[in-house]
Every structure is written in structure tokens, then in C-alpha cells.
Amino acid sequence: MDTEACVEQAKRIIDAGGEYVRLTTQGVREAENLKNINIGLRSQGYDTPLVADVHFNPKVADVAAQYAEKVRINPGNYVDPGRTFRKLEYTDEEYAQEIEKIRARFIPFLNICKENHTAIRIGVNHGSLSDRIMSHYGDTPEGMVESCMEFLRICVAEHFNDVVISIKASNTVVMVRTVRLLVKEMEKEGMAFPLHLGVTEAGDGEDGRIKSALGIGALLADGLGDTIRVSLSEAPENEIPVARKLVDYILTREGHPFIPGKEAPQFNYLSPGRRKTKAVRNIGGDNLPVVIADVWKGLSKLILSSNLTIFIAVEVCPNHEITI
């Protein structure tokens, strides 16, 4: 454990604009050291909340709840064993007993959080669903949602409301669909917990930024999401400007005149299909999708005033081009 390094990294994140800092908390020693990190930051005038990220060991979450403002737990490995890709079979009674095991371990943790005024994040990951969930639901958005809902129902029954939810995947299509499905399921059961958005393993550089913008941006445009994290394989402070740009873009759309909506009867919000369009030469209809590049302003006059042929590349074949 390097307390000083953690404090310095947290300061860089906060100075870049981070509104809270998440720290990986592998074991009990690391959880107890959150106290020292908190003291180190507060002594230098930083009062930004700390979030402990806990996997595999519920005891670590119990300790972390005493020193962090929020604790993230992963339903895929909080009580259920880590993922081994075993196919498990349960009777209805046996499955209900597995849920009771979760209740028996989770409720004492909630009580510790109540005593210490600690919030929790129920953070589901597509890549770490338990064997129990995988065996019952498969590797599906429905399984991810149910993994989260099992814990939310316990929170509701125990009148614990200081909860944030995240439900992430590295595949942006899966991530967007799953969050939308989760919101729908919460509405069915009268729940309205805040959402934390993010794309796992987005990568670095331009690719990581584009991937995060696609997943997070689509949901923000839906009006979903309360906090976000752009996960880049770079220094953590590099994530903040990207997140800020996404939020600022959405905020520019605030305050516009109300536009009454009209439901499209053929449109499935959770599983949108390709829209039917009229073909204009080789675009639309049953033609393959084409990619049209945005032209830099400095070159647009040159291109339009010349006799250059404009090409549009078809996505499917790398070396295939068509002229329009």
C-alpha cells in the first residue's frame, strides 16, 4: 500500500474536475487504509468523497463502509462464487434459497452503511455475472438486470435508499440496451434509483473516447444518467475532460421549447431495428450502409470548386468504393 501515492493521484483527479474518487480496495488492510487516505486529503483541503471498489469479499465492504463515503459492490461476486462458467441447475426452492443467502449477508452490510451514513453502488458488470445468473438467464441483458434487481429489492425491503446503480459492458450496444431495460424494470416495481454510466474497457486514445461517447452519450441523450465515468487506459485525470465535454454537450440542450412527442408504433425502444427508407440511387432502401465523412471547413471550398470526384466508402469491404 502506498498511501502517499494514492493521495497524490486523488489530488490530480480532483484538480482536473473529478467530483469523487474511486479507489480499488482489494482486502481488509486496503479498506482500513482508506482512513489514512481520507485524512491525507482532508489535511490538504480536499473534501471530495471517496468510493471504495470492492470485489469477492463482503468483509472488505463492511470495513470500507466505515471509512469511505460510498462502497461499490459487484452482485456477480459479492456472495455468489466468482465466475467459473459452470452450468448450474436449481429447483425453484433451491433458487429461492440462494437469494436468501444474499439477504443474510447483504443486510448486515446495509446496517453498517446506515450507522456510518455510507452510500452504496450496486455495480453490475457484463463480464462478471455469476454462474447462477448465467445458468438461469444466459449471457444476456436480462440476466444483468436481474442480477441488479435482486439487490435493489433487498434495499427497498430494508428501507435503504442511499443507492446508486451501474450496469456496464464493454460492448456499447449491450450497455445501452441493458441500462434502458433496467430503467424499465425499475419503473415496473416503483423504483427510481440514480444511475452511474460508463463503458468498461473502452481503451485509450481516440478509440476509447469515441467508444465512451457512443455509450454514455446515447443514454444521456435519453435523459438517463446521474453520474458518469469515462474509463480510459490512461492516467485517470485524462478521463475528466472527456466526461466534462459529454456533460456540457447535453447541457447545451437544456431549456429548449417543448416539442410534443409522437410515439412511433413500429419502433421498439429496447431493440431498435433498421428503419425502412426509400432508395436514392445507391443510398438507402436495401443498399448496404455507407459512411459519409465530414469535410474540414478549410478544404470544403477547394473540393467544391474543383473537378474532384467525391468517394463514399462502403463499410463492409475495406477496398470497395463507390461514386455518387
Regions found by a protein language model. Give the residues of each.
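Alpha-helix-loop-beta-strand connector modules within alpha/beta enzyme cores
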Residues: 30-52, 100-117, 146, 150, ...
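Active-site beta-loop-alpha junctions enriched in small/polar residues
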Residues: 26-28, 53-59, 74-78, 123-129, ...
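N-terminal active-site wall of soluble small-molecule enzyme domains
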Residues: 25-67, 299-301, 319-320
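Hydrophobic faces of well-ordered beta-strands that scaffold small-molecule active sites
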Residues: 1, 19-23, 48-54, 71-73, ...
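Glycine-rich tight-turn/loop motif centered on a GG-T
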Residues: 44-45, 68-105, 132-143
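Catalytic alpha/beta core domains of metabolic enzymes, predominantly
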Residues: 92-102, 133-284
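Active-site mouth loops of central-metabolism enzymes
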Residues: 1-8, 26, 48-57, 132-145, ...
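Glycine-rich, proline-tolerant flexible connector loops at the mouths of alpha/beta enzymes
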Residues: 5, 14-41, 75-97, 163-172, ...
